[in-house]
């Protein structure tokens, strides 16, 4: 009810980095807890060093499956004269606003690409606001709201927003870029959120994390696994953090 996008920022990071890791690609093995690191030996997961097939109290497996199926319902929100894009990804929906119904069609490869294309199709020309969430990681010097996880590098580029190919002015309200105008069927909004590789530290008050950094790109936090590296990954050392680049890898099962 607060209308503050910071809660959606946390939800997005949890969906991409926590929830998806709780279930394997085949959908038949699960984490009961959420480890930030694991050596494959210590049996942290109800007697298992990795994901387990089932649990004595098996509330987690059906809940994670249910959550994944509920995600489409979290992608949009609305009030009488506003449409909110709360999560990004290919989708379409119809929103009932005061005086009109609006069909929205979103095209994007997010979270791997920061370009979002939104076609706005009101049943009749109408004035209302389209509100695009601009994540904390894209508009500030910290990865998530709260003051715990600052970036090593400063922000490198600004978010760009256009309507029908023309750069448009917008105002920020609680983490949303608000575009208020008379909309016509076929209007197209394009959002471009830069996604450089960035490194995240933790404030020194969290002593356990001193000397550690997280590698991120957009909303994704990357994990180092032995299968992808030539040796143990418990102690990896980063060189010049300004030299990092992202490459697309062809992972198994079409991911």
Predicted regions and their residues:
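Active-site neighborhood of glycoside hydrolase catalytic domains
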Residues: 1-5
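Extended extracellular/luminal ectodomain segments enriched in beta-structured repeat modules
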Residues: 123-130
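C-terminal beta-rich recognition modules with glycine/proline-rich loops and embedded aromatic residues
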Residues: 9-17, 22-121, 139-163, 168, ...
């Amino acid at each position: 009810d607060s209308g503050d996008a910071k809660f959606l920022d946390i939800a997005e990071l949890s969906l991409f980095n926590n929830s998806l890791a709780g279930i394997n690609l085949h959908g038949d093995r699960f984490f009961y807890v959420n480890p930030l690191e694991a050596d494959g030996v210590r049996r942290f997961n109800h007697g298992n060093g990795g994901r387990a097939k089932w649990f004595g109290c098996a509330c987690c497996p059906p809940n994670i499956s249910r959550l994944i199926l509920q995600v489409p319902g979290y992608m949009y929100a609305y009030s009488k004269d506003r449409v909110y894009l709360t999560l990004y990804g290919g989708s379409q929906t119809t929103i009932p606003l005061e005086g009109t119904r609006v069909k929205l069609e979103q095209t994007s490869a997010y979270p791997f690409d920061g370009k979002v294309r939104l076609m706005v199709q009101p049943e009749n020309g109408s004035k209302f606001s389209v509100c695009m969430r601009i994540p904390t990681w894209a508009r500030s010097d910290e990865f998530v709201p709260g003051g715990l996880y600052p970036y090593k590098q400063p922000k490198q580029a600004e978010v760009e927003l256009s309507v029908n190919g023309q750069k448009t002015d917008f105002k920020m309200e609680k983490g949303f870029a608000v575009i208020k105008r008379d909309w016509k069927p076929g209007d197209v909004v394009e959002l471009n959120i830069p996604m450089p590789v960035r490194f995240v530290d933790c404030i020194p008050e969290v002593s356990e994390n001193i000397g550690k950094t997280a590698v991120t790109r957009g909303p994704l936090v990357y994990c180092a696994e032995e299968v992808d590296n030539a040796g143990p990954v418990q102690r990896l050392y980063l060189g010049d953090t300004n030299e990092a680049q992202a490459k697309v890898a062809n992972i198994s099962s079409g991911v």
